[in-house]
């Protein structure tokens, strides 16, 4: 009971939090999926990204890698064009990297079996790198992840390292990965919807069977009490009649 109360508290806290992502809202391609998950009592999402092509300008030394030392030159959650990359490179001053980052979703789960259901759905949808972690405070997080990312350096110290033809090839490759990513998201949503429906049906069936069993037990108890009452009456009648029989047998 304490775990359920703690989970409910965490879910309420999450619902009140402001979205601190750069975009400030859930990505369009996964809005429906995030809504479906958050409608369930046993789940709530903590972070998400539908997948993106991003060009990052890293202005840092080789000894450290810190997120705050990176600037975004370009980002899109849709298909991109080579011209988008060429335009972004005009502002390059450091080491520029082109990345494709696939769909990622973190979901806090009420119980381990709830996380296992979500994990099974993710694996079947093609997100093979998905996993479950349990924190020190009992927080169960299910991460939906895959490995079909892409990361390629384009410049070093502001100098372009690759040809225009290669950049066009990279954009084509990133777009193919984005299309596959969207297919997996669609598959994940469909599998999740079916799995939740199946769970609800099993739960309803179990509840009905338990209710029916309780009614059956109550009926049996009433019948047993009735039988005992009838037996008691017969025994009383038999006991009362015994003296009369004895009297009739006296000489």
Curated annotation (Swiss-Prot):
InterPro entries: tRNA_yW-synthesising, tRNA_yW-synthesising-like_sf. PANTHER family: TRNA WYBUTOSINE-SYNTHESIZING PROTEIN 3. Pathway: tRNA modification; wybutosine-tRNA(Phe) biosynthesis. Pfam families: TYW3 (PF02676). Keywords: Methyltransferase, S-adenosyl-L-methionine, Transferase, tRNA processing. It catalyses: 4-demethyl-7-[(3S)-3-amino-3-carboxypropyl]wyosine(37) in tRNA(Phe) + S-adenosyl-L-methionine = 7-[(3S)-3-amino-3-carboxypropyl]wyosine(37) in tRNA(Phe) + S-adenosyl-L-homocysteine + H(+). It comes from Xenopus laevis (African clawed frog). Residues 1-23, 209-251 are annotated as: Disordered. It comes from the Eukaryota. Probable S-adenosyl-L-methionine-dependent methyltransferase that acts as a component of the wybutosine biosynthesis pathway. Wybutosine is a hyper modified guanosine with a tricyclic base found at the 3'-position adjacent to the anticodon of eukaryotic phenylalanine tRNA. The keyword Transmembrane does not apply. Its EC number is 2.1.1.282. This is tRNA wybutosine-synthesizing protein 3 homolog. One of its GO terms (molecular function) is methyltransferase activity. Residues 217-228 have a biased composition (Basic residues). GO terms for biological process: methylation; tRNA processing. Gene3D superfamilies: tRNA wybutosine-synthesizing-like.
